[in-house]
A protein has these predicted regions:
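Residue-level recognition of single "structural anchor" positions
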Residues: 1-183
Length: 183
């Protein structure tokens, strides 16, 4: 039901950003550490986009768990208006954003002097701060991997209800009425 609602909303809402608008973009892996050790994580890569001064936080699963430029740039183009300023980390897949109609600014998290702010003061802290609540929500539910896409939509729906101070039950009823015809 919520997935149907999300698909309807996805068609209705336009792209984020535009001239003089800043979009923070980052990718993160959702999953569990293999054997509870080290950095190896089995799971799903998700691309997150958020516009400064907006609550429109978009999460898109990277197809086939691939996060190269050939995969990420079309996703960004689908969700972000050209002319936007995009701020990312130094992941090489973002290196062609300038050639795709965007102003691209980079924060190098491996810079030993300052891994949070770039030298010119730009940062990606807003998108980074949104990963923790999302991952905590998934961690609490311990869902099997095949349920991840639907659960990601449910998380976004619940987040939107909370941010807009809406009753989730009432919104569920509205989604049912909007998506199904009753005789």
């Amino acid at each position: 039901m919520i997935v149907d609602w999300y698909c309807l909303k996805e068609r209705e809402r336009g792209k984020i950003g535009g001239p003089n608008k800043i979009i923070q973009v980052d990718e993160s892996k959702f999953g569990r550490r293999k054997y509870n050790r080290g950095r190896r994580i089995d799971g799903h890569w998700v691309l997150g986009l958020i516009e400064n001064n907006s609550e429109d936080f978009r999460l898109i699963i990277c197809p086939d768990n691939i996060r190269d430029a050939a995969t990420l740039i079309p996703i960004i183009k689908k969700h972000v208006q050209e002319g936007s300023e995009i701020r990312t980390d130094a992941w090489r897949a973002y290196s062609t954003l300038n050639q795709n109609g965007y102003t691209h600014n980079v924060v190098n998290h491996s810079d030993p002097d300052n891994h949070i702010l770039a030298r010119d003061g730009i940062h990606t802290q807003r998108i980074e701060a949104n990963w923790r609540p999302a991952k905590d929500w998934f961690r609490q539910r311990r869902l099997p991997g095949y349920r991840f896409p639907d659960a990601l939509v449910e998380y976004q729906w619940r987040r939107e209800c909370k941010k807009m101070n809406l009753d989730p039950f009432e919104q569920l009823i509205c989604a049912i009425v909007a998506n199904y015809k009753f005789k």
